[in-house]
From Swiss-Prot:
GO terms under cellular component: cytoplasm; nucleus
Compartments where located: Cytoplasm
EC numbers: 2.7.4.21
Tissue distribution: Highly expressed in cerebellum, brain cortex, kidney, thymus and lung. Detected at lower levels in hippocampus, testis, heart and olfactory bulb.
Name of this protein: Inositol hexakisphosphate kinase 3
Phylogenetic placement of the source organism: Eukaryota, Metazoa, Chordata, Craniata, Vertebrata
This protein's encoding gene: Ip6k3
Pfam family, one: IPK
Native source species: Mus musculus
Record-annotated disulphide pairs: none
Positions bound to substrate: 206-214
Similarity section: Belongs to the inositol phosphokinase (IPK) family.
Major location category of this protein: cytoplasm
GO annotation, biological process: inositol phosphate biosynthetic process; locomotion; phosphatidylinositol metabolic process
Record keywords: ATP-binding, Cytoplasm, Kinase, Nucleotide-binding, Transferase
Length: 396
C-alpha cells in the first residue's frame, strides 16, 4: 500500500487507503491498518482524553498514541466503497505493509457483502446485504485460517494476487462499520480517528488473547437499558466470578500452519473450568503447550497489577488486556530441551491494555462520578488471571 494520487484527482486528491486490520480478534469498533506500524479506530473523546493524560507508569502497557486523522468514504474505479485517510505530514513516503493489502482484504469483505464480482456496491445494497452475510454464521463457531492456502482474487487494478489467511472478526467489524457510515452519514462527511501503535507488528505469527477485564462493563453514562444488558452479560459469564472473560483469540497451530480463532460469543459461554482450558489452548501450538511462555507472561501481568494498584480514581470499564506472543516455532539448537525449546533466546511476549472509551478518572472531561482508590474489579480480574496461569504452570 502506498500513498497515491487517484485518477479522479479533482474529487479525491491524495489519501491513504485504510485496510481492515487482519489481526483484530475482539471488540465491536472496526480497527483499520494505516501502515505497518500504525492502526486507527473511530475517535471517542473519552478515549482520546485518556491517551493524552496517560500516567507515565502505564505507558509501557498501552499502545503508543500517535494523534488523530480525518477519514472519509471513497469509491474506487470499480465503484467499491472503502475508507481513506488524509496522510500525516511526517508519513508522506511510501509505506511498507504486510502482503494482506487493502486491495485483497477489502475486496474479500465487499464480495461477501454483495455476492458479485463485477457489480458496483450501492450504499443501500451494502446495508441490506449485511443481514445476509455468511460471515456472522462463520464467526459463531471455531475456524481455522490457513496461512499456506493462497486462492487467487482480483485486485483493484485487475491483476491476480494471493490472499493469505486472516481473522474474520476484523472483516466483520469493518463491514458493520461501513454499513453504519453508509446509512447514517453522507459520503463526503469527514470522520475523526485515533492513530495508535500496531502492537503486533513485530510478530511473524501473532497469537493474541483479548480479555475483557473487570466485574462491570458499562460506563457511567450508560442508559438504564444498556446497564441492564451489560450486567446480564457479566452475570452469565466469568466476568462475575473471575473478573475476566475471553473476548476473542487467535493462536497459531504449527501442525496445520493456520490460526485457530475464537470470538466473544465463545468466551461468554465458558465456565470457570472452560476459561482455564481456553487459556491452556491459547498457549498450545497444536503439538505442545508452550510452557516457556508462562513465566514471562506472568511477570508482565504482575507488573501490570502493580501499576493498576497505584492508579487512584481510575475505573477501566469495558477495557481489555491483550496477551501476545509469536506463534512462529522457536529455533532449536543442540542445547535445546527435550521439548524442542531454544535454550538461549527468551520468549517474546507482551501484555497491553486497550479500549478506553468508558474509562473514567479524576479530571476526565465528562466524569459523572469521582472514585476513590484503584479499580477493584480490574484488580480482581488480574489476580484471578495470574492465579489460573500459575496453576497451569505448576501443572506442567
Amino acid at each position: 500500500m502506498v500513498v497515491r494520487h487517484s485518477s479522479d484527482k479533482g474529487k479525491i486528491g491524495v489519501g491513504v487507503p485504510l485496510e481492515p486490520f487482519l489481526h483484530q480478534v475482539g471488540g465491536h469498533l472496526s480497527v483499520l491498518q494505516y501502515d505497518a506500524y500504525t492502526v486507527c479506530k473511530p475517535l471517542v473523546s473519552q478515549e482520546q482524553k485518556f491517551y493524552e493524560s496517560l500516567p507515565l507508569a502505564m505507558k509501557c502497557f498501552t499502545p503508543k498514541y500517535k494523534g488523530t486523522i480525518t477519514v472519509r468514504l471513497r469509491r474506487d474505479s470499480r465503484g467499491h466503497l472503502g475508507l481513506v485517510a488524509n496522510p500525516l505530514k511526517e508519513n508522506l513516503e511510501p509505506f511498507q505493509v504486510s502482503p494482506e493489502s487493502r486491495a485483497v482484504a477489502l475486496w474479500q469483505t465487499l464480495q461477501q457483502t454483495t455476492g458479485s464480482e463485477s457489480s458496483p456496491c450501492p450504499l443501500t445494497q451494502l446495508a441490506r446485504s449485511l443481514k445476509e452475510s455468511a460471515a456472522k454464521v462463520l464467526l459463531r463457531s471455531d475456524c481455522h485460517l490457513s496461512t499456506q492456502a493462497s486462492p487467487l482474487v482480483e485486485s483493484e487494478d485487475g491483476s491476480q494476487v494471493e490472499r493469505k489467511g486472516f481473522n474474520p472478526w476484523g472483516l466483520h467489524c469493518h463491514q458493520a462499520h461501513l454499513t453504519r457510515l453508509c446509512s447514517q452519514y453522507p459520503e463526503d462527511k469527514r470522520h475523526r480517528f485515533l492513530l495508535l501503535e500496531n502492537v503486533v507488528s513485530q510478530y511473524k505469527q501473532p497469537c493474541i488473547l483479548d480479555l475483557k477485564m473487570g466485574t462491570r462493563q458499562h460506563g457511567d453514562d450508560a442508559s438504564e437499558e444498556k446497564k441492564a444488558r451489560h450486567m446480564k452479560k457479566c452475570a452469565q459469564s466469568t466476568s462475575a466470578c473471575l473478573g475476566v472473560r475471553i473476548c476473542g483469540m487467535q493462536v497459531y497451530q504449527t501442525d496445520q500452519k493456520s490460526f485457530l480463532c475464537k470470538d466473544k460469543y465463545y468466551g461468554r459461554k465458558l465456565s470457570v473450568e472452560g476459561f482455564r482450558q481456553a487459556l491452556s489452548q491459547f498457549l498450545h501450538d497444536g503439538t505442545r503447550l508452550r510452557a516457556e511462555l508462562l513465566e514471562p507472561i506472568l511477570r508482565r501481568l504482575q507488573a501490570l497489577l502493580t501499576v493498576i494498584r497505584s492508579q487512584s480514581s481510575y475505573r477501566f470499564y469495558s477495557s481489555s488486556v491483550l496477551i501476545i506472543y509469536d506463534g512462529e516455532p522457536p529455533q532449536t539448537t543442540q542445547g535445546s530441551t527435550s521439548g524442542g525449546v531454544t535454550s538461549g533466546d527468551p520468549a517474546k511476549v507482551d501484555v497491553r491494555m486497550i479500549d478506553f472509551a468508558h474509562t473514567t478518572f479524576k479530571g476526565s472531561w465528562n466524569e459523572h462520578t469521582t472514585y476513590e482508590g484503584p479499580d477493584p474489579g480490574y484488580i480482581f480480574g488480574l489476580e484471578n488471571l495470574i492465579g489460573i496461569l500459575r496453576d497451569i504452570q505448576e501443572g506442567e
